[in-house]
């Protein structure tokens, strides 16, 4: 009996005090990238949402090295999503005994890190001129490691 090896770990940040829309702008830039490239991007981006996301990515990598004994150079951000949390409502005192409501949005961020060195190999058939001939009894099969969602984020986001 074969047991499937676990290749993904995750880190979850809940009730982070920022808008989900602003966090998604940063998350869309790191999805599908390698761990080291993600850390460089997050250090250089000038947004407030980068620091909590940086901490989550770092935590996910620490989980991967502790739970799976994986190397940081083999890690890829396979899934990163942001969902809206609760809205914290406060009252700000104003003039003449009045108050003004303040809505403070929160969000939940989950980051899934995958170790590509533990992935299964994908069989790739190279085109052989003798592949269709009946004389050839055994086909040559080459295996190459490939990661499907490596470059799926669609380019660099520009600020509007």
Curated annotation (Swiss-Prot):
Q: Which GO terms describe its cellular component?
A: chloroplast; large ribosomal subunit
Give the UniProt subcellular location, in the record's own words. Plastid, Chloroplast
Per its UniProt record, what InterPro entries does this chain match? Answer: Ribosomal_uL22 (IPR001063), Ribosomal_uL22_bac/chlpt-type (IPR005727), Ribosomal_uL22_bac/org-type (IPR047867), Ribosomal_uL22_CS (IPR018260), Ribosomal_uL22_sf (IPR036394)
What domain of life is recorded for the organism? Eukaryota
What would you give as a GO molecular function for this chain, any one?
Answer: rRNA binding
The biological process GO terms on file are: translation
Q: Any keyword Secreted?
A: no
Any one Pfam family here would be Ribosomal_L22
Q: What are the entry keywords?
A: Chloroplast, Plastid, Ribonucleoprotein, Ribosomal protein, RNA-binding, rRNA-binding
- Where it mainly occurs, coarsely classed, is plastid
Q: Which CDD domains match?
A: Ribosomal_L22
User: Has UniProt tagged this entry with the keyword Zinc?
Assistant: no
Kindly state the subunit structure of this protein. Part of the 50S ribosomal subunit.
What is the role of this chain?
Answer: This protein binds specifically to 23S rRNA.
Instruction: Spell out the family assignment given in the record's similarity comment.
Output: Belongs to the universal ribosomal protein uL22 family.
Task: Give the protein's recorded name.
Answer: Large ribosomal subunit protein uL22c
Q: What organism, scientifically named, is this protein from? A: Panax ginseng
């Amino acid at each position: 009996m074969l047991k499937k090896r676990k290749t993904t770990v995750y880190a979850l940040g809940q009730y982070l005090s920022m808008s989900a829309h602003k966090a998604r702008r940063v998350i869309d830039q790191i999805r599908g990238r390698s761990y080291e490239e993600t850390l460089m991007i997050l250090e250089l981006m000038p947004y407030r949402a980068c620091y909590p996301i940086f901490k989550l990515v770092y935590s996910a990598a620490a989980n991967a090295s502790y739970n799976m004994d994986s190397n940081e150079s083999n890690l890829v951000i396979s899934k990163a999503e942001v969902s809206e949390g609760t809205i914290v409502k406060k009252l700000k005192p104003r003039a003449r005994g009045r108050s003004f409501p303040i809505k403070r949005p929160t969000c939940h961020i989950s980051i899934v890190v995958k170790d590509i060195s533990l992935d299964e190999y994908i069989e790739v058939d190279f085109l052989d001129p003798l592949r269709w001939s009946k004389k050839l009894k055994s086909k040559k099969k080459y295996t190459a490691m490939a990661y499907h969602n490596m470059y799926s984020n669609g380019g660099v986001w520009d600020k509007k």
